[in-house]
């Protein structure tokens, strides 16, 4: 089993770039930077894309330029064009149920109220069986404050923890493609930024 498409969820535009909801894009941006594969806008895929070669595998990167709740349009366009199955896709997204400094891989499951995941599941023919990278951003403690929280910028102390978890997730993605998901998952799930 190999990954052929890695997606980082985000809202477009400078005003959202540093918000918690864009944590998935931070991960893809760092992966592209580390592997010297700059992202370029590709209108037919409704996003910024690049291509990397990891452990002999050809992997496409995508950061949709649609709004978060329309992310599925970009993912489905790329998956259809390159004939990529849902279980060959890794979607990185912000995760309220994990604290800053923690990131975890997961296969399948629901959308947990995340509008980006909800749209991707829908546009992949109601198929939730894609991989996810859940980047912890913490929870405001009150569900009525969630929207403002995810669209807000984390304080520098939290940003540092999120950045460290994203950095570790990039390293673990390279391990996944070279040595398999089990080894990558064991390492990532043992990590907690201090």
From Swiss-Prot:
InterPro entries the record matches: Pept_tRNA_hydro (IPR001328), Pept_tRNA_hydro_CS (IPR018171), Pept_tRNA_hydro_sf (IPR036416)
The record lists the catalysed reaction(s) as: an N-acyl-L-alpha-aminoacyl-tRNA + H2O = an N-acyl-L-amino acid + a tRNA + H(+)
Q: What class of enzyme is it?
A: hydrolase
Q: At which residues is there a site annotated Stabilizes the basic form of H active site to accept a proton?
A: 94
At the top level of its lineage, which domain of life is listed?
Bacteria
Q: Where in the cell is it found?
A: Cytoplasm
* Assigned EC number: 3.1.1.29
Q: Which GO terms describe its molecular function?
A: peptidyl-tRNA hydrolase activity; tRNA binding
| Pfam families, A to Z | Pept_tRNA_hydro (PF01195)
Q: Which GO terms describe its cellular component?
A: cytoplasm
Which PROSITE patterns would you find in this protein's record? PEPT_TRNA_HYDROL_1, PEPT_TRNA_HYDROL_2
Q: Active site annotated at which positions?
A: 21 (proton acceptor)
The UniProt entry's sequence similarity note says: Belongs to the PTH family.
Tell me the PANTHER family matching this sequence: PEPTIDYL-TRNA HYDROLASE (PTHR17224:SF1)
Biological role stated in the UniProt entry: Hydrolyzes ribosome-free peptidyl-tRNAs (with 1 or more amino acids incorporated), which drop off the ribosome during protein synthesis, or as a result of ribosome stalling.
Relate the assembly described in the record. Monomer.
Q: Specify the protein name.
A: Peptidyl-tRNA hydrolase
- From what organism does this protein derive? Enterobacter sp. (strain 638)
């Amino acid at each position: 089993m190999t990954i052929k498409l890695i997606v980082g969820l985000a809202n477009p535009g400078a005003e959202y770039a540093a918000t918690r909801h864009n944590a998935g894009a931070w991960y893809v941006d760092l992966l592209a930077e580390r592997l010297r594969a700059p992202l370029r806008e590709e209108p037919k895929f409704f996003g910024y894309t690049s291509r990397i070669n990891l452990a002999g595998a050809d992997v496409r990167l995508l950061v949709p330029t649609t709004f978060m709740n329309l992310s599925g349009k970009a993912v489905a366009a790329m998956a259809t064009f390159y004939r990529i199955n849902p279980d060959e896709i890794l979607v990185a997204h912000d995760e309220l149920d994990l604290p800053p400094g923690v990131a975890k891989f997961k296969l399948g499951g629901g959308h947990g109220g995340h509008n980006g995941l909800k749209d991707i599941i829908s546009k992949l023919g109601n198929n939730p069986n894609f991989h996810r990278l859940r980047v912890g951003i913490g929870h405001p403690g009150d569900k009525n404050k969630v929207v403002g929280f995810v669209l807000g910028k984390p304080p520098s102390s939290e940003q540092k923890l999120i950045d460290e978890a994203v950095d570790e997730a990039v390293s673990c993605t390279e391990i996944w493609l070279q040595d398999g998901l089990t080894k990558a998952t064991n390492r990532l799930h043992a990590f907690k930024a201090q």
